[in-house]
């Protein structure tokens, strides 16, 4: 699947260099995520080819630190 991987807080992995981004690509390809490619889109790391089990934004009942 494709999407924004999330932190335990429910927030997207943030990034600042839009487009091709080494940090996002590395985050997406981490073994537990299984992604094939990652880049920075709307200041969040967007991943392609994630494992179905990888949590992606938005998470149900998690609003990125807001209550």
UniProtKB/Swiss-Prot annotation:
A GO term from the CC aspect: extracellular region
Any one GO molecular function term: toxin activity
Modified residues (Cysteine amide): 64
Domain LCN-type CS-alpha/beta: 1-65
Domain of life: Eukaryota
Keywords, sorted A to Z: Amidation, Disulfide bond, Ion channel impairing toxin, Neurotoxin, Secreted, Toxin, Voltage-gated sodium channel impairing toxin
Propeptide: 65-67
InterPro entries: LCN-type_CS_alpha_beta_dom, Scorpion_toxin-like, Scorpion_toxin-like_sf, Scorpion_toxinL, Scorpion_toxinL/defensin
Localization per record: Secreted
A Pfam family annotated for this UniProt entry: Toxin_3
Tissues/organs with expression: Expressed by the venom gland.
Any single biological process term in GO: defense response
Disulfide bond entries: 11-64, 15-40, 24-45, 28-47
Function as written in the Swiss-Prot or TrEMBL entry: Beta toxins bind voltage-independently at site-4 of sodium channels (Nav) and shift the voltage of activation toward more negative potentials thereby affecting sodium channel activation and promoting spontaneous and repetitive firing.
Domain notes from UniProt: Has the structural arrangement of an alpha-helix connected to antiparallel beta-sheets by disulfide bonds (CS-alpha/beta).
Family that this chain belongs to: Belongs to the long (4 C-C) scorpion toxin superfamily. Sodium channel inhibitor family. Beta subfamily.
Name by which UniProt lists this protein: Neurotoxin Cex9
């Amino acid at each position: 699947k494709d999407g924004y991987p999330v932190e335990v807080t429910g927030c997207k992995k943030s990034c600042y260099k839009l487009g091709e981004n080494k940090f996002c690509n590395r985050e997406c390809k981490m073994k537990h995520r299984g992604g094939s490619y990652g880049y920075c889109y709307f200041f969040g790391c967007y991943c392609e080819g994630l494992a179905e089990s990888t949590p992606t934004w938005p998470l149900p009942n998690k609003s990125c630190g807001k209550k």
